[in-house]
Amino acid sequence: MNMFLKLILTAVLSVIAALPLYSQQLFTGNAESFPPELESIYLKGLDYLQKSQNKTGQFQGQYGNAPGVIGLCVIAMLAHGDDPNSGKFNANIKLGINVILNSANKNNGYIGDSMYNHGFATLALAEAYGAVNDDRIGPALKKAVALIVSSQNRNSKGAWRYGPESQDADTTVSGSILVALFAAANAGIIVPDEAISKALNFYESCLTNDGGFGYSGKDSPNYPRTAIGALVFALAKKKDSGIFKNAITFLSTHSANDTGGQYYHYGLYYAAQAFFHAGTQPWEIWNEINIKTLKASQSENGSWNSSQGPAFTTAAALLSMALNYRYLPIYER
């Protein structure tokens, strides 16, 4: 076991029994407690996204035109805390939101060509709702949520997969959707309790004996899927459950590179939020190492890259550090 895993495991085991106590007093830090290199790394990444966005609101590189990826880039900008209507990135945020709104089906609210896109784009609308001055956001968000619920009601697993008509489900697509539902509920949109409970039941059906989460059943648990599972149970206010605690232990004893690096930054995006809910000490240790690792791997132009393209990868890397700012409603605990 490498030093990173040893540090995380030690921290987790020391506080895991006291998670309910921590939940009452988490995260009262301020800008003075940020890791000193955070701001320069984050701004360098945002500057890359700003420069790589074209006049239509899309981003350079693979998947940079996908509304879900554009949504994550918008969220990364919102997460820094600049005024979305007059700050440095306001034009970029509005361009991105415009792409998402124009990508939505006018009849049923479906955004893009996959539920992955729909989930991340819906999350962006939820985080922008009430912050970005655009009267179209509220109605589009309500339609997007209605499509999610209707899709789930038709799904035999009670969750989601690639299309709104899918009858099977997996933990990765469902994660993007379920987090969007929590964000929409935070924004004041009505989300049926049954939608959350059915989705959590699906996740329970994917639990493995070692505390991880499989893909579509009790199969092949890995770091990203388990980070997603931990997060959705945390957002459902089940941080005192054995499911959440065991998932955090799984993450603490496995490498973020356990998928061969292909989904490394994707896993960081979810793991950051999962550890954030696990308690001050585990998150601070994880966060410090994550920032140092991302600093060392950041390209000269400010981006990070992978097989998912520079826009998605950069947004995911930034969002894994964005909890330090705690400006987004979904990050308020």
List the predicted regions and their residue ranges:
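Bacterial N-terminal signal peptides that target proteins for export
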Residues: M1-L9
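Bacterial N-terminal signal peptides
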Residues: I8-P20
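An alpha-helical repeat/solenoid feature that recognizes helix-turn-helix modules
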Residues: Q24-K44, Q58-N92, N105-A146, S150-S197, ...
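Surface-exposed loop and membrane-interface regions of Gram-negative outer-membrane beta-barrel proteins
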Residues: I100-A104
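Predominantly the C-terminal beta-signal and adjacent terminal strand-loop region
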Residues: K295-S299, N305
